[in-house]
Amino acid sequence: MFKVWFATAALVLAVVQVMTGARIFGKLERVVPIPRPQVNRVHRWSGRLAILCTLPVAFHCIFILGFQTTNARVLAHSIAGSFVYGVLAVKLFFVHDRAHPRWVLPVVGGTMAAVLTTLWATSALWYFTNVRFGF
């Protein structure tokens, strides 16, 4: 049950990441009317917290459950879970490397958000709609 809520928190923080990332790149200035230094700070901390929320979930999924292929949902979840920290590593590499085209970082960030959304949809959303919604 804790995994569902941690995954949901990570997804909410990923949405914050997408919104603030778009604001940093000059988009959504009216939607996110926060000055640039604060947007940078919110972007960094929401990313750190999102990854922090994924760690207990990943630990449980990797070491207790492992890679599974029982049905299409579980297979999609296992594949997305296999990619999530690899995509994170690529994103962190491009954050610190300035010798890349300007479009690369938003693409990698969007890929990270898509992978987290896939993980959430194939786990927490499924749990909320098929098992139960509650604490």
Residue ranges of model-derived segments:
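Membrane-embedded alpha-helical bundles that constitute the cytochrome b-like, heme-associated redox core
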Residues: 1-135
